[in-house]
């Protein structure tokens, strides 16, 4: 029979069934992770030195198999998914035989046959689970191969069977009767296990391990990462000779330990050397049979003992072996407690969670087998699956020595790694045994440190400014930079930069200085950085849209001579010296220019730029890059990338990312054209690529996170790569192998895909890999080889970078960080190196592969994030006592941050924590998940146990992006819900949360800008249509986005072009505006007239609401129950008191005691109150003031209906029980504009086409509900407010007000729009006083509408007062204002929000004039009548009051101080 025949198989019948042994359950679970994997096959072959009678051997085998119960079973699953063991007699299986003596290498042919048989998966539901072969390799040399699934036998069980086969074969051969096997029964093992689990010993063992691993120590492995067991493994076998083995045994006796404990000590020391970990946790397989009936039963009972030991470099072999011996003596008595159960106990199941690391399997079995007198040797083929590394040690018989086989998971290590690990282990073993009292750290294996060299630079290195100057002189007419329809030639660019350099020199800026550059993306930004460099100074880029606190922190670190920025952002920099690029210099500075010294060209040792990264100390750190490093990088990267002057390169990154250095300087130094992307280019991936095609882009330099989405879209056919693109460069974080494979299949090798790696400290990029290389295997994503002029050394697995591209160091005094720059003694001449903290390995092809980090640093969307910096921001929150942040790698390869917070009292709302962090940190550093704990876990040394926190992070299942989803295009009645599910599934995947419901606002779940881009891209692919990023911002719930997309689809089918002049009302709006028939005055006792003792107030933490609260407490004696969005009453109260302080409202302690804070949520049924509390408030509150609402000028009705309309319905239901008066705060914007109605009555309004945006619509619907309630006899009032401005007393300004948003956007740029002629402005303190008097002063009639309208304020007067205050303004039509504002400052922050509001009206209005915001005459007769005789009068809004508002804005930084003064004289002293 040929050795290439199929592997042995068969079938069998099932009879009864039995539960699996605990050890078998672990094997079963592991097999289900990959049912077709052969990893759980275990096998040996016995080399028999002598003739073998194959027929007798076959008889002996059948005899032993028949008497071995574990080999006559199958494994089945019941309807509940529970596995069972059933009887399945082996039956007619056969011994495979083959004569291989004719093969060129019979022994090799036999091993090859075994490899093929081992690669066949076993069907556990069929019999048999084993196989045997007898292979003849010489006339009297045979190999008996026996393979069995690990669920049936462990290694010791396999040895029992082998010994029994030798015994039976010998008896049959010599003609003696076959003795009884002496095997025990499986039933006895099962009974023993049951008794153990019910015993006190089980509990004692459990307690021992739970205590030993309570802190869940980190698991250190040379790979630095995890992977599932592969279907194969790398193996390297070395025999330790008899003399070496005897020396080992002798030293062990001298040390009073066993030889296996010496091997364990050396292995632990070797892992300590490779990982630097202070604790090593080994996986030690144990028989678990001593003193057990299983000692004579072939079965699977093997367990894993996690051996935890501290290792230091100063340990000697004597000390470490003794420590391990003590640990073993402590743990072995508890070895029966199952390893799998301990992992469950410690919540270390799934994901990256591990209990122990590399395995050391010591097999001292007596294996002296003789077959009819002929000797044999046993060779292990496979000991089972390999998670990471396994060191298998076989004690061979008759003094033959030890065999050491190192097995490794090929998904984590290559063959070179295995060789290095084994040789290092044996080298350390030899030295340690020779000097057992010498520190093991001194015996560190002196393996040659591998150094990769990028080779020489292609020619002399020239300064970047010199290269750009040459292009300006020689190719001055060529386009250097394009942006949004504008372009500038090299001559113009260099001339503008030179003018700026002279301007800076006039301010005494030059060599040795740093200039901060906070300029939005565009031509001005490129001019700014070149101008700074030409002045001799270094530039420090800042994100102009970053929170002010963040910018202040970076400026404190950078210590710039001045700040270059646009007028729109100048106010953010306080009293620092500022140069406004969009404004001419003051005359004094202009006059100084001719006498100023000429700019001095920088020297190679001067700084070129300072760029900030996240810092391990909790503060960002500025990395200083010199001109020499920048020039070397440009020379090496330009050569490696093949960039030339004919290329057109997208400038994608913001300046404060160091990728911008690569984009800008490589392009300009090559004489190519830099095309600066616009904001709308990234609305969708297809849109981005279409724009690239229109712009004739040939070279794309993209963040890896964005490229992931681009690769996905291209691979699915949702987008196409422009034909002009010839090179794509990616970098910033590890590329996902799945995305790389998609790209290769879709794009092939026609376009170069370069994967770059490099920390900021090595000037952007240090290594590059060609991912389009067809020789790369699927899933292989190297980071490549060093750039020319750069070298890379790998020391104990950590990457060190060498060369002239290294940073000067860090800004300021940073000893811990500066230690990363140091001479590398392991390399010849000890050159200066940067220790990256990145773990890598060198593949067989000589290229680097990234493995992970050696510290806690994490990459999120290209941002380097040190947890300490996020933790520092968290601890600044008043409601946080302690905090720790960990990075979580999800199943699909994406990453997120998880914050673990110990609250200081009641837990603050997660949304408030996120708001706090957004004010201090970049968006990518705001954690996606926040978990509250009573305390943080800590190690025995008192440090935060980050491994325990990582294990506690929510184990989120992320759906497969390729998984089948319901067809969103199917025409069914459930179309909308199907589409909702599709949208929710994509959000769930990207946000990495357990679930996203149709009504979840994804921004409340932590969505960030890059994730919105990802979702827009994946929905475009899934729905086979373009989904724009802006739509996701406008429709933040799956339900609303589904409705919006459906409406668009219907309009497209109906070919509605153009859209009607006035948008129709949302289809749900009119239905929502119908009051439930059961809401009507009930039979309860009606309220008594007069001021109530208890008032329910919603919205007390808002601008109007906090003043209403103050007025209720001042003018009445009532208790005020305030509903507040908060997790607890204490947190709700804290929010109220904080709001009072912010608005400078001072109340007596007596008044404050009348505030009752109730946690609630207007967007939930019954306001989020439980039935009991809702009923109590219904019974006890004598009036309801419904002021709370979600106010947004951008959001659609569907996202506001719950909080604004449905909450009103719930409060009407409360009011109806006892006819409790309900006073509703509405808005004059519900009224039709002047074009539809010349007058606004004090009456309820019918629907009209002026209800254009969600907030209007939600308030109108609520009024309709109140109108119907009034018709049924319920006492209600409606208070419509116009523009509510700050209190007359303090001049406080509500920055969220729409008009103030317009002023914040336009005043710094010196431009304001013509919006309307006039509108009502009412101070908030007057509104509060009037509303409380009108609502509670007397029992109202069944329905009264109050239009709170005062004397109108003319917008032209407001603009005049602004100019009088000191702001030079140009007034212009809205369309012009929008265009100039977008061009002068970019669409960022408040500017972006304001512009987005007007953008949302474009389809429905005349863009030349904008939306119609004017109202007709506002009737306020009811207000006048109601306030008559009360003494309440509204103060006028005049120049003095507006000046007080402006004083407040300047003081708080809402607006910049006018040029030449620090504010109006009326500004209060500080």
Curated annotation (Swiss-Prot):
It comes from the Bacteria. Residues 974-1049 form the Carrier domain. GO terms for biological process: antibiotic biosynthetic process; lipid biosynthetic process; secondary metabolite biosynthetic process. Pfam families: AMP-binding, AMP-binding_C, Condensation, NAD_binding_4, PP-binding. It catalyses: 2 a (3R)-3-isocyanyl-fatty acyl-[ACP] + L-lysine + ATP + 2 NADPH = an isonitrile lipopeptide + 2 holo-[ACP] + AMP + diphosphate + 2 NADP(+); 2 (3R)-3-isocyanylbutanoyl-[ACP] + L-lysine + ATP + 2 NADPH = (2S)-2,6-bis[(3R)-3-isocyanobutanamido]hexan-1-ol + 2 holo-[ACP] + AMP + diphosphate + 2 NADP(+). Residues 1049-1059 have a biased composition (Low complexity). Residues 584-603, 1049-1070 are annotated as: Disordered. The modification O-(pantetheine 4'-phosphoryl)serine is found at residue 1009. Its EC number is 2.3.1.-, 6.2.1.-. InterPro entries: AA_adenyl_dom (IPR010071), ACP-like_sf (IPR036736), AMP-bd_C (IPR025110), AMP-bd_C_sf (IPR045851), AMP-binding_CS (IPR020845), AMP-dep_synth/lig_dom (IPR000873), ANL_N_sf (IPR042099), CAT-like_dom_sf (IPR023213). Its cofactor is pantetheine 4'-phosphate. GO terms for molecular function: ATP binding; ligase activity; phosphopantetheine binding; transferase activity. Disulfide bonds: none annotated. Keywords: ATP-binding, Ligase, Nucleotide-binding, Phosphopantetheine, Phosphoprotein, Transferase. Coiled coil: none annotated. Nonribosomal peptide synthetase (NRPS) involved in the biosynthesis of a unique class of isonitrile lipopeptides (INLPs). Catalyzes the final step in the pathway, i.e. the condensation of a (3R)-3-isocyanyl-fatty acyl-[ACP] to both amino groups of a lysine, producing isonitrile lipopeptides. Can use (3R)-3-isocyanylbutanoyl-[ACP] as substrate, leading to (2S)-2,6-bis[(3R)-3-isocyanobutanamido]hexan-1-ol. Contains 4 domains: a C (condensation) domain, an A (adenylation) domain, a T (thiolation) domain, and an R (reduction) domain. The T domain acts as a lyine-specific peptidyl-carrier protein, and carries a lyine residue that is transferred to it by the A domain. The C domain catalyzes the condensation of two isonitrile-containing moieties to both amino groups of the lysine bound to the T domain, a rare activity in nonribosomal peptide biosynthesis. Finally, the R domain catalyzes a four-electron thioester reduction, releasing the product from the NRPS and forming a terminal alcohol product. Belongs to the ATP-dependent AMP-binding enzyme family. This is Isonitrile lipopeptide synthase. It comes from Streptomyces coeruleorubidus. The gene is scoA.
